[in-house]
Amino acid sequence: MAPLLNTGLVILPLIVSTLLGPMPAFAQNETCATKGKPAGKVLQGYWENWDGAKNGVHPPFGWTPIQDAQIRQHGYNVISAAFPVILPNGTALWEDGMDANVKVATPAEMCQAKAAGATIVMSIGGATAAIDLSSSSVADKFVSTIVPILKRYNFDGVDIDIEAGLSGSGTIGTLSTSQANLVRIIDGILAQMPSNFGLTMAPETAYVTGGSVTYGAIWGAYLPIIKKYADNGRLWWLNMQYYNGDMYGCSGDSYKAGTVEGFVAQTDCLNKGLVIQGTTIRVPYDKQVPGLPAQSGAGGGYMSPSLVGQAWDHYNGSLKGLMTWSINWDGSKGWTFGDNVKGRL
């Protein structure tokens, strides 16, 4: 990234503007303020930086610009941009070329989407964008390369969606190396961003309520990290993935994904507080944005619009919102998820 102009030269834009006329709108909107946590209910969807139509996953709706008006029209007011490339040494890349026709939004386009109502967070991780959490040097390299991207592209927050490499120590009060390095990453990012910069997390259920069965390895591995940021107020909300496998309640009880019963058991467990080795990890309803597949095929445990409505209505507006994988999947099948939830928020 090019260095900023010396403050002694700030008169230059005025001279250029005077000689050449007003600067074009795109030049004026390259930067925009961090928006902070949305005050109302949220419908959060993942935006894919690859083409799911071209590769045959979810035709006919594939990649779409992040400022596409359809996204907002169908209810999505929080966008999780997925995912940056992470090189083995921790270097983060956010660039065109995931597929031939795919382009990441320019800073001006990000501002355009935000001005239209979107809060945009960058989602880190996913099933294929792992980071080596065994190395503090890799963690530091990631922080040093992702922060300039977050600033340059006007992101409002980060979403932690790491699905590989995180493992618990077996003792809830002692962080493993991988847990400590994930905290190192989160703290490193938050320390360099505005105070209203957001943090969300989207772990699979095994990493959270799975800790009710046993604490160690992947089981419950997110719990001490969730507790740290829920307790200190930096966690906007939790997007636990209520899909892709059976789900556990607070007492080791098991539920099928895609059921209202399982949705309620998970949600109530987090609100009540999961007790692990005498430590309580609690995420109240107003910090829960449960994650569901947008359409059949997007993930195991798909819930029909009717079942989604039953699950949401059970809480009479207590939940912060709902998350879905993904905006692009929803667009491929008529936006039924977004339209259904939009009418209930």
Swiss-Prot record:
Residues 41-345 form the GH18 domain. Belongs to the glycosyl hydrolase 18 family. Chitinase class V subfamily. It catalyses: Random endo-hydrolysis of N-acetyl-beta-D-glucosaminide (1->4)-beta-linkages in chitin and chitodextrins. GO terms for cellular component: extracellular region. GO terms for molecular function: chitin binding; endochitinase activity. Glycans are attached at residues 29, 89, 316. Keywords: Carbohydrate metabolism, Chitin degradation, Chitin-binding, Glycoprotein, Glycosidase, Hydrolase, Polysaccharide degradation, Secreted, Signal, Virulence. This is Endochitinase 4. It is an enzyme of class 3 (hydrolase). Secreted chitinase involved in the degradation of chitin, a component of the cell walls of fungi and exoskeletal elements of some animals (including worms and arthropods). Participates in the infection process and directly acts in the penetration process of the host cuticle. It holds the Pfam family Glyco_hydro_18.
